[in-house]
Amino acid sequence: MHSINFRFISRILGMMCFVEGGMMLSVLMAALLYQESPTPWIATIGVFFFVGALLLHQGRKLHKKRASRREGMLAVTSVWLLLSAIGMLPFLLTGALTSPLDAFFETISGFTTTGATVFTKVEGLPHSVHLWRSFTQWQGGVGIVVFTVALLPIFGGGASQIYNAETTGITHDRFLPRISDVAKRLWAIYLAETFVLIILLWVGPMNLFDAVCHALTCISTGGYSTRDASIAAFDSIYTEYILALFMYIGGLNLTLVYFAVTGKPMRLFKDEETRFFTIFILGATVITTIWISLQGEYPTLEGNIRHALFEVVTLGSSTGYSTAEITLWGPFFWMIALLLMFVNGCAGSTSGGLKASRFLVLIKNLYNEFKKQIHPHLLTPVLMNGRQLSVSVVHQILAFCVLYVALIFVGAMLLMLDNNGFVSSISIACSAVSNSGPGIGEYANSVAGAGGFSKGLLCFLMLAGRLEVFTVIGILTPHFWKR
């Protein structure tokens, strides 16, 4: 095992700082447009460019060679941490937040598309801060690193390692031979979805600014809102159905969505994971509708269906918007909510969570084990889309699921040590690892009341969940650092 090429990592980080500084220019323009102080944004852009220049200088003598898996894992994790560390500056410089820990939490929650917030009220924030919160989620949706791989092919052979570290999971389709081509097309469809959603939201009761912010946070399944009451503040049936549709789309495999809009829709509709995810969402919606109807939550059947659908899709896609106070829906729905947080969208989507494909493999493997109890010599391979998964892939999925669940429960236990309640600890740990945003209980709307240890732990859980556990946990093992 060769030593880690830190010059390679420095060069990636340097390029990412320049990309992020360039992207923040749009927020600077928004500040000028709304006659807000440009100083926080100019200062932060300057820091991005200065740090980027230092890192590029450090990586200037990079020799062309193929990057290892370790370097890809370390680079991606470092990108998220560095951009969150610099990206938190506007919150402090504008006075929106005074605690560096709170500012870091808000930023990494944005970049990981979790959507948990330390703000108790957001409606008084400057327009530029709202746009930055939304923009962090939009960038984190498909992945800042994927964006860089798409536009900066100088990474050469290392591009695939960066891409793989950022987008771990079951992949069925390598529809283009070059990783940079894959990334470019993913970002093209991502941009198209964003612009379509902006127009559709603007047609409704939202003004243009709200439409832009919510389009950015919906298509990325992030969930930040410009309103304290989230989507309920708009009191619009049209808006709720439009957002529910696009949250569902955000939970689909983006590669298959690309095929669907380029003349091959059957690739999407025939995909086994897509069908499972759709049935899962519809089934949870039906059960929830029946439950809240029996509870007498809303006077009309349409109201019960709409609120059930919205909350199921927002949880099932890891978005985190809200039209209702789901804590009041009772423990039965809480269990449905936790299950939705566990599954959370398809592989290759912007959603967090275990992913529908892994959950489906678990079910199939469990079914095969039942059959083996009756017929011990029966050969029962696990199939996905008619293709047999190798034993090593199935074992990897099982290992991932065990680690995923263990991370949630260890995280919940540590949160309980910091004087958090049982329900709140379980829900917010699950929410952080699955990047779902708001939890159940005292942290349903904000984690402002959490202690410093809890907030720091949640930052770690959000990052581990966004990079699908193995990437971050692997870096913490002694074996990772051996030559």
Question: Which residues does each predicted region cover?
Answer:
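Membrane-proximal intracellular helices of multi-pass ion channels
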Residues: 1-483
